[in-house]
Amino acid sequence: FGEKLSLIPVASPDYIREAGEPDTPQSLVNFRCINRCFPDGEKYRWEFIGPSGELSEVAVKGDLVVDADSAMIQAAESGLGIAFVYQSLVTQQLSAGSLVHLLPGYRYPADHFCVYYPSRKHTPAPLRAFIAWVMAQNKNILGQQTARHRSRPED
């Protein structure tokens, strides 16, 4: 069901010259990162799968918080820190050299996705059908996500 989305950490060459490069996801806490937050204000934790398959989640540090990919990319290109963005959105910048892919030995666990909707109490039939279809199309990758979906309390 569609192409897997992959988030990657990127930074400008100028930022890397100034601050150096992280060697593990955990070392990102020592760098200025450009954060993204959820609607409730909680900051997004960066997730990685390492070369040996281990999963790590990092609560990065940084004062700049944005809610748009374009702003995050522009901030990274301007040398304001490390951004965690969809690889498909920065292919031109990576090719041009204005951004550098950091931690290339690590990958984002792109086997999950979210469907946001206002309430589970009175979900319209077409939306329920769509969710069922998406879950059926992705049954081989859902695992924990299916359990999470079912265990959420009713709104």
Where in the sequence are the language-model features?
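A conserved hydrophobic position in a structured secondary element of the catalytic/binding core
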Residues: 10-11, 67, 85, 134
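C-terminal effector-binding regulatory domain of bacterial HTH transcription factors
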Residues: 87-92, 96, 106-155
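Short secondary-structure boundary/capping segments
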Residues: 1, 24-26, 37-38, 55-56, ...
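Alpha-helical segments flanking ligand/cofactor-binding loops in enzyme cores
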Residues: 26, 73-74, 128
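Secondary-structure junction motif
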Residues: 32-52
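Flexible hinge/capping segments at coil-to-helix
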Residues: 1-6, 10-36
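Hydrophobic hinge/microswitch elements
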Residues: 56-101, 108, 123
